[in-house]
Design a protein with these regions (language model features):
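Charged, often Cys/His-bearing segments associated with DNA-binding zinc-finger transcription factors
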Residues: 1-34, 42-43
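Polybasic low-complexity intrinsically disordered regions
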Residues: 2-8, 57, 75, 82, ...
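Secondary-structure capping and boundary motifs in well-ordered enzyme cores
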Residues: 30-33, 52-58, 98-101
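A detector of single, family-specific signature residues
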Residues: 36, 45, 60, 78-79, ...
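An N-terminal domain-cap segment
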Residues: 38-58
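N-terminal core-binding DNA-recognition domain of tyrosine recombinases/integrases
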Residues: 48-52, 71-73, 111-114
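Alpha-helical support elements that line or immediately flank enzyme active sites
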Residues: 59-71
């Protein structure tokens, strides 16, 4: 997909120091199979038959990824896009000709992905492409879990405390929210599987779901002590260290 940089972007590209953010974004640009991801979303994306035409799908997807990578709220992302030429370049936004997507537009795009459960399709398309390119070697899997904290006052659409969220204790600290159980390729460190549960679900109970079945080794930290004795792991005949 061709993209003509603006004069300011070309000038920015000539500077001598390359920041860590720029290196990361350059790597993501090369890794992500953009055409395949756009094909997942395109059937559900507004065509603009009525009213003003929607912002281009690729730009919205790029902005969405930036929001996820840097953990920015809608308004903070809007500000960051105005402030950072590196982010503008990745999102393919030329401020001399256009503005950045506002908070309402960002929210609508996220809801589109959620309503049609498109994130699973995006994740699957990325992993299929990485495997085909030999970037997911699939010989070993690292398993881990991370808490996704939410304010205890978080309510669902019915204005009730979300039943999918629970409290858990880690060390001396209590958390309320969800937990992401992650399986990652040992060599590339790229994530191949994610299972999301309530925060109080024990790490060991989801281990088998994080394995793709082709690995010869599984690596886990002390939080997975005793996992080898679980029936589902014994059945898989996988040694975990």
């Amino acid at each position: 997909m061709t993209h003509q940089p603006s004069f300011s972007q070309a000038e920015f590209a000539d500077k001598k120091k390359i920041t860590r953010r720029e290196k990361f974004l350059t790597r993501m640009e090369a890794l992500i199979p953009w055409a395949k991801l756009l094909a997942v979303i395109e059937p559900f994306y507004p065509k603009g038959e009525r009213g003003r035409p929607p912002i281009g799908l690729e730009r919205m997807l790029r902005v969405y990824f930036l929001q996820q990578w840097y953990g920015l709220a809608d308004e903070a992302l809007e500000d960051a896009l105005y402030d950072s030429q590196a982010l503008q370049g990745f999102a393919r936004i030329d401020l001399t000709a256009e503005g950045v997507p506002d908070a309402t537009t960002l929210l609508k795009f996220r809801r589109l992905l959620e309503t049609h459960d498109l994130c699973k399709g995006l994740f699957a398309a990325i992993n299929t492409d990485l495997t085909a390119r030999g970037l997911l070697l699939r010989e070993g899997t690292l398993v881990d879990a991370t808490l996704i904290a939410a304010p205890p006052s978080t309510k669902n659409k019915e204005k009730k405390r979300d039943p999918e969220m629970h409290q858990t204790r880690k060390g001396n600290q209590w958390y309320f929210g969800m937990k992401a159980h992650i399986g990652a390729d040992r060599d590339s460190k790229l994530v191949h599987t994610v299972v999301v549960t309530a925060a109080n679900v024990a790490d060991v109970t989801k281990t088998a779901e994080l394995l793709h079945g082709q690995e010869t080794q599984v690596h886990a930290d002390a939080g997975y002590t005793g996992v080898e004795q679980r029936a589902e792991i014994v059945a898989l005949k996988r040694k975990i260290d």
